[in-house]
Structure formats: C-alpha cells, structure tokens
Amino acid sequence: MMLHAQHMPGQPGAPSLVFLHGFSGDCREWQPVGEQFHGCSRLYIDLPGHGGSAAIPVGGFADVIRLLRATLISYNILKFWLVGYSLGGRVAMMAACQGIPGLCGLVVEGGHPGLQNEQARAERRLSDGRWAERFRREPLTEVFHDWYQQPVFASLTAQQRQALTALRSQNNGETLAAMLEATSLAAQPDLREALNALAFPFYYLCGERDSKFRALAQEVAATCHVIRNAGHNAHRENPAGVVDSLAQILRL
C-alpha cells in the first residue's frame, strides 16, 4: 500500500523534494512554495487520514513511515530532501531519526521534537483524546473554530481563522480523529538526542511571531531560519519568505 501523492518531475540530477503537510491539510498545502522549485522533482504527499489517503488506517508512526517508504519507492525517488510542517515535520523527524534510505537533508517548519517527561505526555494524550472525540462527534466547522483559538495560532487574524476553518472543515472528522490519536505528540519519543546526531543537513523554519517554536528550535542542532511576518504556519502566511529560505538551504 502507498499514500496518495502528486508528483511533478524535475530536471535530471536536481534534488527531489518530498513535502509533508500539517494536521488537517493535504498535498496541496505546500504547492505554492514547491512550485517555485520547478527544476526539482517534487512529491506532495497526502498523509493517512487526509485527502486522497483519508481511508488509509494507521496505528502509529511506524505505519506512517512504512507507507512513506513504500510511496517513495513507487515513485522511484532514491535521493531526496524531506520538507515537513507541524505534523508533517514530526513525521519527517521520526523518519530521519529511524534512518529512512535516500534522505539527503531535512527541513522542518514548526515541528515539535518531542515532550520530555511522562506528565507532559499524559496531559497531551488527554488533550488530543478530547479533540479526537470532538472531531468524531461535532460539526467540523465548530471544532475548527475552537481549534484555531489555541495559543499557537494567536498570530492569526480573524479573517485568516475564518478561511482556515472553512478549508479544514472539508475533511473527514473520523479519519482526522484516528490520525490525531495515532500520531499524537504523546506517542512520539523525545527526538532531541537523535536529531543532534544526524549525519546530514537539518534546518528548522519558524515564523517570527511563533515564540513557542522559536524556543524549541534552539533545543535541536539545526540551523534556524526565522520567517518574517509569520506565525506558526509560515509557509501559508509568508510563502515568499519560505521560498527564499529553501532556496538558500538548497543553494538553488
């Protein structure tokens, strides 16, 4: 089994870029950024529970990474950079730390490296369980209205919240809930030590208004690019700034 994806071929010899979206996004999320790198092969993946992969069930990160590997093989992508946002960034970090073949570099935007104690994991497990129950039982417009009131999204304007709520409400609440539980931050190990030992380039992107993740970026051995005029979802709020950073990283 493989994940649904959209593949855009590039020029021979150019690096392949594999993009992983955030929770409740899909393969279209990174395209405004990725299409600026038309010389590179680009693969935009729908994670399980999302988009064209909505019906694919997973029990945890191991299943997601197995599906990611199978998808890369199916597209004959042998050497690549992983670029992931939030949930996609956490999947990318997990894959990198487990040693996914062919990975040349890692770019994470607003991805958490992991909680550091059992109390924090227990609290997060409880919180994610409550959200999952709401996704299963309530209208998605109501759930996402509240979702975007969380502190990490404090920099969003009312108009941005409204637009995101409308967009994300097109998802399937049941499959979102299942993926939220399977890949909860509570189920993710603390990756700091493993990330600090990576043998390939690791870069971290965060919005200048995203104080939480700017602080987390200092805890991993990554070169940090701060994206101006952006909060947690920097590639949506300032795609040109993210394009500039990726161009510097990839030296294109």
UniProtKB/Swiss-Prot annotation:
One Pfam family hit: Abhydrolase_6
GO biological process: menaquinone biosynthetic process
Bilayer-spanning residue ranges: none
Family matches, as Gene3D superfamilies: alpha/beta hydrolase
This protein's record includes keyword Hydrolase: no
Gene: menH
NCBIfam families membership: menH_SHCHC, PRK11126.1
Source organism: Salmonella schwarzengrund (strain CVM19633)
Quaternary structure annotation from Swiss-Prot or TrEMBL: Monomer.
Keyword flag Lyase: yes
Entry-linked InterPro entries: AB_hydrolase_1 (IPR000073), AB_hydrolase_fold (IPR029058), SHCHC_synthase_MenH (IPR022485)
Superkingdom of origin organism: Bacteria
Function according to Swiss-Prot or TrEMBL: Catalyzes a proton abstraction reaction that results in 2,5-elimination of pyruvate from 2-succinyl-5-enolpyruvyl-6-hydroxy-3-cyclohexene-1-carboxylate (SEPHCHC) and the formation of 2-succinyl-6-hydroxy-2,4-cyclohexadiene-1-carboxylate (SHCHC).
Name this polypeptide is given: 2-succinyl-6-hydroxy-2,4-cyclohexadiene-1-carboxylate synthase
UniProt keywords, alphabetically: Lyase, Menaquinone biosynthesis
Similarity field: Belongs to the AB hydrolase superfamily. MenH family.
Pathway named in the protein's UniProt entry: Quinol/quinone metabolism; 1,4-dihydroxy-2-naphthoate biosynthesis; 1,4-dihydroxy-2-naphthoate from chorismate: step 3/7; Quinol/quinone metabolism; menaquinone biosynthesis
A GO molecular function held by the record: 2-succinyl-6-hydroxy-2,4-cyclohexadiene-1-carboxylate synthase activity
UniProt-listed Enzyme Commission number(s): 4.2.99.20
Catalytic activity annotation: 5-enolpyruvoyl-6-hydroxy-2-succinyl-cyclohex-3-ene-1-carboxylate = (1R,6R)-6-hydroxy-2-succinyl-cyclohexa-2,4-diene-1-carboxylate + pyruvate
